[in-house]
Amino acid sequence: MKILVTAFDPFGGENINPSYEVLKNLKDNIEGAEIIKIQVPTVFYLSVEKVIEKIKEVKPDAVLSIGQAGGRYDITVERIAINIDDARIPDNIGQQPIDTPIDPEGAPAYFATIPIKEIVEEIKKENIPASISNTAGTFVCNHLMYGILNYVHKNGLNIKAGFIHIPYLPVQVLNKPYTPSMSLGDMVKAIETAIKVIAKKSR
């Protein structure tokens, strides 16, 4: 079994992206699944293209994407991706689409196909705060989640896919008073727990 895990490069003036720091620290084999890791650019469309290329290359059983949600205090497992880009800030090459469909011929939205409630419950058993989120936003995180699910759906692929948002790392909030953060160790444990659930359910 293969699980493709994606993370983003830094964006929005940050020097690091916790999703990539987590990705680098994941084990290479979890619950008997080979973990294939890829960093993707925080760029509309290009991020999706990079992941689709990797899907074609490695033919994974599941794809789990991780992204930063600065301001959230817990691990948030996304329920749904919507067919819209509405960027509050530019992406990493200056694109800032407003009220733009991701795929004019695509479905209005797609639900995650990973077991979101079980993932949340298992993460909480590790004494790490977690919840289901009903919005992945309208920036590149939602864009990537939608793009992957859209590709899987249109091509009739038997690949589970979903997205998990994680908080800032403590080092990112040194000058952001009252902004929540989470330790790298807890975030790695949370994502590895999510992967264990996905691996069990994908067999």
UniProtKB/Swiss-Prot annotation:
Subcellular location as annotated: Cytoplasm
Gene3D superfamilies assigned: Peptidase C15, pyroglutamyl peptidase I-like (3.40.630.20)
Highest taxon of source: Bacteria
CDD domains, sorted: Peptidase_C15
Active-site positions on this chain: E78, C141, H165
Keyword annotations from UniProtKB, A to Z: Cytoplasm, Hydrolase, Protease, Thiol protease
Assigned GO CC terms: cytosol
Catalytic activity, as annotated: Release of an N-terminal pyroglutamyl group from a polypeptide, the second amino acid generally not being Pro
Molecular function (Gene Ontology), one example: pyroglutamyl-peptidase activity
PROSITE patterns named in the record: PYRASE_CYS, PYRASE_GLU
InterPro entries referenced in this protein's UniProt entry, alphabetically: Peptidase_C15, Peptidase_C15-like, Peptidase_C15-like_sf, PGP-I_bact-type, PGPEP1_Cys_AS, PGPEP1_Glu_AS
Disulfide-linked positions: none
GO biological process, one term: proteolysis
E.C. designation(s): 3.4.19.3
Family (UniProt): Belongs to the peptidase C15 family.
Subunit description: Homotetramer.
Function: Removes 5-oxoproline from various penultimate amino acid residues except L-proline.
Protein's name in the database: Pyrrolidone-carboxylate peptidase
Organism whose genome encodes this protein: Thermoanaerobacter pseudethanolicus (strain ATCC 33223 / 39E) (Clostridium thermohydrosulfuricum)
